[in-house]
Amino acid sequence: MRGKGVPVRLDKVSFSYGEAPLTFDVAFAAAEITAIMGPSGSGKSTLLNLVAGFETPQSGGVLIGGVDVGAAPPAARPVSMVFQENNLFAHLSVEQNVGLGRSPSLRLTEVDREAIDGALARTGLGGKEKRLPRELSGGERQRVALARVLVRDRPVLLLDEPFASLGPALRDDMLDLVAGVHAERGMTVLFVTHQPQDARRIGRNVVFLDNGTVAATGSADDFFAGAGPEAFRRYIGASAGNAVSQDIARKRT
């Protein structure tokens, strides 16, 4: 499954860490960007891990493109994921870290190398192919992680607060890069964020989690216009819905 985004559904999924049960029954629209928000401990990262295959539901099903992927290991699922920790290999160069998205053994064909060069250029890393991760800034390391996603070319992209450690300007740059890539490739993007500004900047939809379940879903415009549940308004704060200027560069498709 490659190319344009596909729908993602968690169908009556239950999961628990010890005494904390989580239940997810939610659908994510194909080829759209959905912000997943909620208090700490509400299950945001767990939801992404269930989609990616890093966690296994105790009941219910995970469907990607209408196919139940419960039996598929993470590597076989049509998803890519970027974490807050960029998961780069310190001893590998930029181009090698990106190349892992094409071949875990780094046995690369000419087509693979062309894809890597294109991804590095698209993410602003041209000319830095031979550098090691320690020679890069935090924002550049996350660009490497995103370039690796591009060469994998999966229809679903999962973002688990990958830019949370960056300053506001760098974070905006990375969000705009994600929005630009989404506009070009049309993948389904699920991204976890605590930042209302981030959700408003690129999110078309919002899924709000509270107490280990899906408390509400809807369009980002409606949520930030006050139509979200009271728990969401408390979560973002009374003035956060108006914190982002109305003339912000919206990068949606």
UniProtKB/Swiss-Prot annotation:
InterPro entries xrefs: AAA+_ATPase, ABC_SmlMolc_Importer, ABC_transporter-like_ATP-bd, ABC_transporter-like_CS, P-loop_NTPase, Thiamine_ABC_ThiQ
GO terms assigned for molecular function: ABC-type thiamine transporter activity; ATP binding; ATP hydrolysis activity
Subcellular localization(s) per the UniProt record: Cell inner membrane
Entries under SUPFAM superfamilies matching the protein: P-loop containing nucleoside triphosphate hydrolases
Annotated keywords: ATP-binding, Cell inner membrane, Cell membrane, Membrane, Nucleotide-binding, Translocase, Transport
Membrane topology: Peripheral membrane protein
Record-listed ATP binding positions: G38, P39, S40, G41, S42, G43, K44, S45
Gene: thiQ
Family note: Belongs to the ABC transporter superfamily. Thiamine importer (TC 3.A.1.19.1) family.
Classification via Gene3D superfamilies: P-loop containing nucleotide triphosphate hydrolases
Domain of life: Bacteria
Entry keyword annotation includes Cell inner membrane: yes
Protein name: Thiamine import ATP-binding protein ThiQ
Pfam families: ABC_tran
Keyword Nucleotide-binding on entry: yes
Biological role: Part of the ABC transporter complex ThiBPQ involved in thiamine import. Responsible for energy coupling to the transport system.
EC code: 7.6.2.15
GO cellular component, one term: plasma membrane
Signal peptide: none
Assembly and oligomerization: The complex is composed of two ATP-binding proteins (ThiQ), two transmembrane proteins (ThiP) and a solute-binding protein (ThiB).
Catalytic activity: thiamine(out) + ATP + H2O = thiamine(in) + ADP + phosphate + H(+)
Main localization of the protein described in the UniProt heading: membrane
Chain ranges of the ABC transporter domain: 8-236
